[in-house]
Amino acid sequence: LARLLLEKGADINYHKPDMVFPYASTPVTEAARSNNFPMVRWLVEQGSNITLVDKYGDRPYSVAVQNKNQEMADYLKALEPEDWHNEQEKVRQLMPYKLPAKLVEYLKTGPLRLEFPERELVKWAELYSFMDVQEMTWKRKKLLSLMVQMDNYSDYLLLWSPRDKKLWYLDIEHEEFHPLAKWDDFIADPGRYLNGMIEGEFEK
């Protein structure tokens, strides 16, 4: 079907939001999201632009990282601009976000998987490594997305806001955006904050 659509002149990099894909993702990003490596490879060979990001900063490589598909991530990483995976360049790129040194150090050294089995709703979460942190814009605010995924809930983003130097969260489904905590407070007890987030404790 994809081959037929391209033969008929479809835009391989089409990424306007619609009812099916409201986040303005490209076909190759959606192929990565469904873990379809052969389709990703085929779309790339047909000229897909793997550097285009969707509304939440995702691109094929970051989706492969989220899906823990190392083979796909390695394939896409090799095709991306080299400086996207260069630590000095990443430091330069993220300077405007005024990240605390402790946060940067944590994302470089880990542990990136946070576990709190005694909690009820969310028992674990996984943060991005420093190199994989994603830039995104929400209602004209420039933010950094720090969390790959968390237990039971896929519609929440954990974000760093340079404006007040705090963690915020975004409930994608309900478009709720609220402040959560300073980094030091959050990392001292992430289970409390992530479960409180789900329970609506921080909605102000």
Predicted regions located by residue number:
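Helical anchoring/docking segments at protein termini
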Residues: 85-204
